[in-house]
From Swiss-Prot:
Xref: SUPFAM superfamilies: P-loop containing nucleoside triphosphate hydrolases
Chief location: cytoplasm
Chain ranges passing through the membrane: none
EC identifiers of the protein: 2.7.1.71
Cofactor names: Mg(2+)
Keyword Ribonucleoprotein on entry: no
PROSITE patterns to which the protein is assigned, alphabetical: SHIKIMATE_KINASE
Protein residues bound to substrate: D41, R65, G87, R144
Binding site for Mg(2+): T23
InterPro entries reported for this sequence: P-loop_NTPase, Shikimate/glucono_kinase, Shikimate_kinase/TSH1, Shikimate_kinase_CS
Subunit structure and binding partners: Monomer.
Enzyme kind, highest EC tier: transferase
Organism: Acinetobacter baumannii (strain AYE)
Protein name: Shikimate kinase
């Protein structure tokens, strides 16, 4: 049963590359906190009635990022939420501002090898539909890692335990710093 102490915590936002486990860890974290869990990519699909690959195909990445910013502004304005963001959400300055100013941001750092292992069969990741997905992941991480670190209040490595354990570790880290 969630503690009363959790009620005073701000929203918690998970950022990181595709395959980091943001959705899985986020669900466990929300369960520990007794909070609603949302995934921004799922919310974009729900609100538009279109899949992310379709949006990328018809509107390009720019169109998708525009939709993503609208949804993130809306979601980060809510309360008592654990939110998993899309891997590229931090590429847009307004999104970084929404996240950093409206809650606690946790960067789930994931080595490229683990990202590849977790995503190589997933056809719903438009940015990986290329000849060399491993190189694409390396290129994305090189660009995005500094942005994840810029926005994050905490960084956790995801190759250190199961999703439930990572959620517990995140909660302990946040609570121990809140008590200081």
């Amino acid at each position: 049963m969630p503690s009363k102490a959790f009620e005073t915590l701000p929203n918690i936002y998970l950022v990181g590359p595709m395959g980091a486990g943001k959705t899985t860890v986020g669900r466990h974290l929300a369960e520990l906190l007794g909070r609603e869990f949302l995934d921004s990519d799922h919310e974009i699909e729900r609100k538009t009635g279109a899949t992310i690959p379709w949006i990328f195909e018809k509107e390009g990445e720019v169109g998708f990022r525009t939709r993503e910013t609208v949804v993130l502004n809306e979601l980060t304005s809510r309360k008592a939420l654990v939110l998993a963001t899309g891997g590229g959400a931090i590429t847009q300055a307004p999104n970084r501002e929404f996240l950093k100013q409206r809650g606690i941001v946790v960067y789930l750092y994931t080595p490229v090898e683990l990202q590849l292992q977790r995503t190589y069969r997933d056809k719903n990741r438009p940015l990986l539909q290329v000849e060399n997905p491993e190189q694409k992941l390396r290129d994305l991480l090189k660009i995005r890692d500094p942005l994840y670190r810029e926005v994050a209040h905490y960084t956790i490595e995801t190759n250190q335990g199961a999703a439930r354990d990572l959620a517990q570790k995140i909660l302990q880290l946040i609570l121990s710093n809140k008590l200081k």
